[in-house]
Structures are given as C-alpha cells and as structure tokens.
Amino acid sequence: MMDLFPDALASACLQQFRATPPLVHCLTNEVVQSFTANVLLALGAFPAMVVEPQEAAQFSTMANSLLINIGTLHRARAESMLSAITAANQAGTPWVLDPVAVGGLAYRTDFARHLLTLKPAAIRGNASEIMALSGMATMGRGVDSVDTSLAALPAARQLAQRTQTVVAVTGEVDYITDGQRDVAVTGGDKLMTRVVGTGCALSAVVAAFCALEGDRLHHVATACRIMSQVGGQVSQHVAGPGSFVPAFLDGLYQLETLTY
C-alpha cells in the first residue's frame, strides 16, 4: 500500500503558507468563482480574477501564482488564459491547470493538450480528466468521473514524466505524483461531491501552494490534505450540502494543524 502523506510534512507546509500568504490569479469557471475566492480567503490567501486579456497578462506578472480552470471555456476566455500563461511564464510565476471535462468535448480537449506544452507547475483533475489528458480511454461523464483515482495513477505518472510537472488525481483517495515519487491522501466525504466547486476550489488551493518555495510535490499534497481533512470533518456535523458550505469555510479559517 502506498504511504500516506505524513502529518509533519503537511503541517510544516501549512505553516509556511500561513507565513507567506500568496496572491492567486484565478482564471476559473463562472460557476465557482465566488466559492473559490471564499475558500482562498478562508485559508488566508488573496484571490483575484482578472479576465480581460491585456489585464490578465499584466496581473499574472504581479501575482504569486495563476490558476487556469477551463470549466466554462469559450474563445474569449481562452485568449485571456493564453495571455496570462505567457506573461506568467515570462515572469517565472507558477501556474496550475484544471482540465475540467476534457476527453468528451473536442475544443476543450485540444486546448488543454496545447496548454500542456506551456509548462504548468501542477495539474489537478479527477481520474477521467487525467486519463483523457494523458491519452488513455476514460469513462468520464461531463465534469464527473466514473474511473477511480487508483486506476488513473499510471496515467498521472506518465503525464507527470512527460510534462515534468506534479499531477494530482483526486477522488475517494487522492494520488499526487511527480512521475518518480507518489504520495496518497485520504479523507474527505461523499457529501463534497454534492456541492458545486469543491474540486475547482481545490485546484485554486493547489495554485496557492505552488507559490511556496520548496518541494512542490509536498506542497500540492498539502493542498489536497487540507481540503480532504476539513471536508471530512465538517461532513460529520452538517445536515447536507446547504449547511456544508459555510461550515467548510469556517473549518478552513480555523485550521491550525493537519492530522489523520
């Protein structure tokens, strides 16, 4: 069995994050913008969502990291994303790709595969998305995955090796790999799948942690630990999706340490 990501490393990364809270430029989908911003704020980061192409490029040189989420992709948004990524790469700003619903739709799949050539610092997706991005057959259904994260781990490793990045494939168990090293993160709750935007918000947290100096595999794994731990804890004390969201934000705000 793969080793779980250690508490001590996760807690150290969280302390580093709290000491240097990043400014995160989020080019994310229109369904989840408010929730994503609130998750980052609850953790202590600073979100911004600048979408006009010229401004997106300018702001990416000011931010500490950039999120590219293609959930509600259209051509104008794609232009903004390419402008932001180009500027981020020139400035040395790390950026994260969330390849929402790739595989089933041609335009976004082609666009996401082009983005792979632009050197993302990390990629975060569900099993079907990661398998599709790597070129493997999947059983995805829109933004949802029918494949398991463990089944997608070989694809994640291959994708990480090919793109020289960290890949997080998330599900009942999250697996994070740089193509050579793998770590696992457990926790969370099925209730999280009944709330729009938990995966997209995780990608924003991954982007925030990619702003930190040090071992990027550990930083991405810590982002997954945070969302899984708080989500799992909160789910035990709420009645359903409606009460989950405010309790989840409170849990992120109050988070001090990471323990299984």
Swiss-Prot record:
Keywords: ATP-binding, Kinase, Magnesium, Metal-binding, Nucleotide-binding, Thiamine biosynthesis, Transferase. GO terms for biological process: thiamine biosynthetic process; thiamine diphosphate biosynthetic process. It catalyses: 5-(2-hydroxyethyl)-4-methylthiazole + ATP = 4-methyl-5-(2-phosphooxyethyl)-thiazole + ADP + H(+). ATP binds at residues 124, 170. Pfam families: HK. Its EC number is 2.7.1.50. It comes from the Bacteria. NCBIfam families: PRK09355.1, thiM. Belongs to the Thz kinase family. This is Hydroxyethylthiazole kinase. The gene is thiM.
